[in-house]
Amino acid sequence: MQPWQCLRRFALAWWERTAEGRARSPREEVGPRDPGGRGEPDPERSSPPMLSADDAEYPREYRTLGGGGSGGSGGRRFSNVGLVHTSERRHTVIAAQSLEALSGLQKADADRKRDAFMDHLKSKYPQHALALRGQQDRMREQQPNYWSFKTRSSRHTQGAQPGLADQAAKLSYASAESLETMSEAELPLGFSRMNRFRQSLPLSRSASQTKLRSPGVLFLQFGEETRRVHITHEVSSLDTLHALIAHMFPQKLTMGMLKSPNTAILIKDEARNVFYELEDVRDIQDRSIIKIYRKEPLYAAFPGSHLTNGDLRREMVYASRESSPTRRLNNLSPASHLASSSPPPGLPSGLPSGLPSGSPSRSRLSYAGGRPPSYAGSPVHHAAERLGGAPTSQGVSPSPSAILERRDVKPDEDLAGKAGGMVLVKGEGLYADPYGLLHEGRLSLAAAAGDPFAYPGAGGLYKRGSVRSLSTYSAAALQSDLEDSLYKAGAGGPLYGDGYGFRLPPSSPQKLADVSAPSGGPPPPHSPYSGPPSRGSPVRQSFRKDSGSSSVFAESPGGKARSTGASTAGAPPSELFPGPGERSLVGFGPPVPAKDTETRERMEAMEKQIASLTGLVQSALLRGSEPETPSEKIEGSNGAATPSAPVCGSGSRSSGATPVSGPPPPAVSSTPAGQPTAVSRLQMQMHLRGLQNSASDLRGQLQQLRKLQLQNQESVRALLKRTEAELSMRVSEAARRQEDPLQRQRTLVEEERLRYLNDEELITQQLNDLEKSVEKIQRDVAHNHRLVPGPELEEKALVLKQLGETLTELKAHFPGLQSKMRVVLRVEVEAVKFLKEEPQRLDGLLKRCRVVTDTLAQIRRQVDEGVWPPPNNLLNQSPKKVAAETDFSKGLDFEIPPPSPPLNLHELSGPAEGTPLTPKSGNPTKGLDAPSKRNMDKAVSVEAAERDWEEKRAALTQYSAKDINRLLEETQAELLKAIPDLDCASKTHPGPTPTPDHKPPKAPHGQKAAPRTEPSGRRGSDELTVPRYRTEKPSKSPPPPPPRRSFPSSHGLTTTRTGEVVVTSKKDSVFIKKAESEELEIQKPQVKLRRAVSEVVRPASTPPIMASAIKDEDDEERIIAELESGGGSVPPMKVVTPGASRLKAAQGPAGSPDKGKHGKQRTEYMRIQAQQQVRVGYQAPRPLEGCTPRLCYMPLS
């Protein structure tokens, strides 16, 4: 290739890049004009424009999002959502004229610079002056085509995406909200142009259009700073935007810096989360994020230059998709029309044939590593300075694989710095920004063909797209891609003469050919005139920054782990230095014969694919899995390893880099050095299949990890919900407890009591102090005879008076507190009583159940046997049963009433005389009146019990001090001890033993005679009234409540003519047991009976025992009626019930106040009866014909 061709291409590229920034407004003139010409401003928007400037934007129409626009054209990529504007273009004549003048000036300026550059080239290379002049003429002729090519073709193809515009606008607003907290600009709403020579701003603009299309708020980012700008009028051209940026960053940016090719203005596409180069100011809308990216002039000549003040963040270059959907159609157009065939024969390898002639497309194609699209392309800015000295670099051109690769893979950073093959040592990147070479993305390391530290022309720059994702490759697609489209090798031509003109530096120092090639042989591999390098060489491999910092000399443990996965194909040392007629292994040499081309192509394709897969697989799974060992490092000196240390089956990533293992190496043949290694297609397919299996396994593991993460999230979410529900329940319960009236009343009473106690404590303390002082004064007077001063005594008297007044107030306050506390404590008192009485009640119920069980078993046995015991057997069993039942009834509360019907009473003769008893049968018809009397007496007993309970309730609610104190003492005693001992009452009050002499011989009125027979005649006059109530009970008048319960056992005892006490019974001992159980049940504590009766009045209390109580009362009334019908000549005596007497003796003090007198009588009488019971004897007399057996109690001598 001739040097003048190189210079021509340099000149063309330089002129295009220089004129690109200047001529954006003029090129927009190419857009179609609206037929309407100018319109009238809206009357309601008549305020003058803030800025007067010309408008160079495209004519456009706003359409509704529903798609009501005019045709398919006019649809913006980002429209202001909700605007419906179909007005035509409104430009004034001044704006149009200014636009034409501006475009003319810029064209003239560009032509002048181009001519100056061409003259410089002619003077420096006079031998190529003619060719350069022809090139200059052709460039002038091609100028209109250039501008027509720069037209936004996508404006006519994307008119049917209003929904996307809506989504993008919403996303832009949402993401810009996160920048609200950043630093605001210290400036008014607008800015003014102070330089009168600036003629690039829009001159005239109608107020309606400027306000309608004003973006509102813009976020400008430069380096680490972010400024928010409020704009009331439209940014109508790039010059306006440049002026705004220069005004916002006055100390850092100027208009000249913004217009230089080293500065890029990027705008964020919220829909795809990617920054792309701003080419049309109509893309700016409300809350847009604009980033200014600038390179230092010192490094501007190198595409991968150093970044200092520009902070190129990850979202600028890590595009998840292409830059914008409206510009995908012209992605390939700048490069493909010039690179559609192989490079010209004379083109040097340092210049890519596919150099774009237009502005770089804003796609992943043009992303040269971490640089914005403006810098994709070859380093041509200072070509004149380089052409004379060092050979041209290999050039940087977009990777052809960027078209097919996935867009969700981050692009690699470009290792192109001061030296093309500069070695990266321990994470020291050439980019200053944190998202440079050592970010998470894969790193593409370029190696120099010659001296790695020479000028970039020696080794050149290699830029690659990101590694293709595993999911986008299949074995067949890879094979067809490699064999059909990428490799077009000829017998003597370059190996990769494809349309992209891709150039690669050598993959490793071992594969460098000797610089001094033999005479007659092809030029050295690094020569600018050598053929194009192998595209599949291992230098295209990449590795991730695996742990802390990756480096070339010492790779991280993640990189070491790759040695187990795959290896890049290498060559024995004999092949590293090819002879005159041979080609180096990786294509850095003269063309090779075509016989082994297919084999080498496959090997290199495998190297490329294995490197890509290794970087993904090992960084995902084996990060830091194996420790770093010194044996795995290969130190390089000046970027080159010793040729005598070949690594079979592994190709180094760059000069001095640690070799990255690939698939198992092919068998190295023992043939001479010139013979290549043969790899069969079967081995290739096996390797590809293994790679596919590995990729599928990795996908499965990734799916499992995702499922596990989702499960963990669900479990955490469920736990949070459960905890939240529990907390809310507890909070609501606490709030409900606070709202409870009883709880609130208790809290208030407790607070009042604490205040009362505090006051009382204070008074007590003051009184103690006063007493001590008075005692001291008294001691002083007594011992020292000291005269007490009068003021001191007056002071003590005053303190005493104050204490007395305070104490009086406290005492007056106590009754109210007492009443409140009684109301609150009533619930506790009732609860304590319940705790005391409930065990007794349950035991009584259980005993009754046992008695019923015994009775039923006895009846069943008699029915089954069909034999009824004779009466004398019953009489023989009676005394034992009576004695047993008497002992058993001491703790008995309830008994079952007798099932047998009432029988007539008969006398039994005393056992001392031995004479038979004279039966005195009563009138049978009187027994028939018993049911009616029993019903009346039942009603009377219920009424009496109700009155008793009401009196007790009234006494409880009146809260007399005596009752409350007694109740509280009772409660305290009941809490301290368990159920009181019921046997203690009969032992504590012994009485005189009754004798028969005390009994009168006759008792004409049976029940009245019993009290007079009490020994010692104590309280005889008082006890006369008690049996009187008993005799009046059958009458209609209701008696007072206590007497019937006070003497329940006043019937059934008679005396014979000799004065002996005889107990008459209607049946066997079961009846006596029944009577005793009746008396015991009636003699239960008063609270129980009251509670049982009060159930009729107050249903909220303990469940009643009314059935058994009423049944027992019915039996009792029946007995009384039969006693009266038996005749008045039989003087009865009480049936002694020691258990009942003990209960009454124990319960006597706890009786109600209105029955105190009768309670004392009852207690005294029961004590006497208890003494009688000790001396009672039993006898079974002879039965008489036609009479039921009787039981006789005889007094002991």
Curated annotation (Swiss-Prot):
Biased composition regions of type Basic and acidic residues, renumbered to the chain: 19-45, 404-415, 595-607
Modified residues (Omega-N-methylarginine): 364, 371, 535
Keyword Cell membrane: no
InterPro entries hit by this protein: AIP3-like_C, SRCIN1
Signal peptide: none
Pfam family, one: AIP3
Name this protein carries in UniProt: SRC kinase signaling inhibitor 1
Organism: Rattus norvegicus (Rat)
